[in-house]
Amino acid sequence: MAEEANKDADISSLSLSLDPEIIGGQNNFLENNLQQIFQKIIQERGPFRDLKEEDLQKELQKESIKDESSAKSSETENVLEFATLDSKRNVNDTEVESMDSQAYKKELIEQIMIAQTECSLALDMTSLLLSKFKENSIETISPFLKSTVPPSSLQFSRSQPPESKESDATLAKCWKEKSLTSSCKFLFEAKERLTSVVETEHEYYTELVKVKEASWPLFNSQGSNHLSVQYSCLGGISLGLGLIRMKPESKSFEVQSSLLYSQAALKISILNKDRDEIGSSTWSWPSQNCNSVLLKDIYKLQEILFEMDIWNSLLQEAQSCGNQGVNFTGDEILVPISDDHVVRITLETSSKNTESGFTEDKKSNEDTSTNFVTIKQEKELLKCLCDTLNAIAHILFLKHCRKSDRRSQQPELYMAIDANAPLILRPLIFYYNLNQESLEFQRWLKQRDISFKFMPNYPWEKAKDFLELENSLSINRLSISWRIMVSNFEPAIFIQHTPTLHGTDKSVWRCKDQYSSNQFSSLKNVCQYIEHHINSLSRRSKKTE
């Protein structure tokens, strides 16, 4: 009860002045007692809608006269003060005293009038809308609107249509024609777009069918709507996946790969003692007879990757061939074949393959026709030798990539590297050394006028297909027979040469005459044996004489 009495006392002491500067200082009190303040305003001022602007202006004039006659400090001690509407003003500012209070009051009244008009209009429209359903809503309508507008007038079911004109039919027809024309154009453009999409999809899957019929495996790429083709499945040890996509500019399909080179080929050259190239061979693949551009791209990528795999395998094998004089860097592999000649193996990655040829010095232009023919023949022989070495390297690498269990004439290839190192350089060195050793033995026999018959038994000469050729080139042991006729009256000497690529068997020369059978581990010992045999025959002939 004491608290309610204090509240009544506080409200009774509240001054309802129209000057906003007089009210202030007790904002919390006003916020907590707004309902009681509204009751006091209605008691003293009456309903808000009955107020008139003239009465408010007269009251403002009276208050302004009263404010001018009283002291500013004594009259505002027991009066609540409201904060000014302008947030930028400060109560402690010294410029507040010099402001024109009349202009500020006028601005406040204008804002109140605007708010009153908006609230009154909103109340009238809401009451007029609800007057059809609630009868007491009529009481909140303003007297002027109540006298001019009937209740529930906002609920009319329809408005009166305008009068029809002769041009309405023509206008409607024009709009319909325009609508049909635009719809037809839109449908035609949609048809063209769909036709283009369907034709592109048809062409795309037609190309995929051609790729699939050519035995190229296709895979679904994760995170992409396009398929990938494995272009290394027919050879090589790398995976080789390419994404099949369409070129936006040419509307054609291509295989996007991660290869660094647009063209690659293995090149084998022969260098002289001055490191000049006297013969070379760059590998080239035969052209594929196919009408599909996509298949041609796949074959090209396969050839590039295959050549890169051969080069990587040669580098891997060269690391274990140092005892045979093989030197290698990241760009070339050097294999010595004699004191004056070296075989160089490189990977050509230029856009155009360089033509292999014989490097002639300036003196070759002054040679006679006989020397020219000799040089030309030497050039052809060197070119043939390089081509042979290049072909054998490709065959041995293909053998390295194949599985051990083959099926008929179409063996499957696998992508993993064998546990054993590749066998490409070592067989080439083995075949070349064997040939040089045979030529050296023949020259030695000719110098001594010894008749002989060379009877090699090379397994690749009997190969009937490509698989047998692969197997024959990778055979570990060969067999070469010699028939030496030292005299017309004595039986011939039979020599069986069995060179081995691997192993610890050193007795590779087996010599048999009418008196004994011997085994030797080198050609030098064989030559000494033949000389000893000839000397023995000569001594016997002298004794008989």
UniProtKB/Swiss-Prot annotation:
Component of the Mediator complex, a coactivator involved in the regulated transcription of nearly all RNA polymerase II-dependent genes. Mediator functions as a bridge to convey information from gene-specific regulatory proteins to the basal RNA polymerase II transcription machinery. Mediator is recruited to promoters by direct interactions with regulatory proteins and serves as a scaffold for the assembly of a functional preinitiation complex with RNA polymerase II and the general transcription factors. Keywords: Activator, Nucleus, Transcription, Transcription regulation. InterPro entries: Mediator_Med17. This is Mediator of RNA polymerase II transcription subunit 17. Belongs to the Mediator complex subunit 17 family. GO terms for biological process: positive regulation of transcription initiation by RNA polymerase II; regulation of transcription by RNA polymerase II; transcription initiation at RNA polymerase II promoter. Pfam families: Med17. One of its GO terms (molecular function) is transcription coactivator activity. The keyword Manganese does not apply. Transmembrane segments: none annotated. Component of the Mediator complex. Interacts with med18, prk1 and rbp1. Its main location: nucleus. Residues 149-162 have a biased composition (Polar residues). GO terms for cellular component: core mediator complex; mediator complex. Residues 148-168 are annotated as: Disordered. It is found in: Nucleus. The gene is med17.
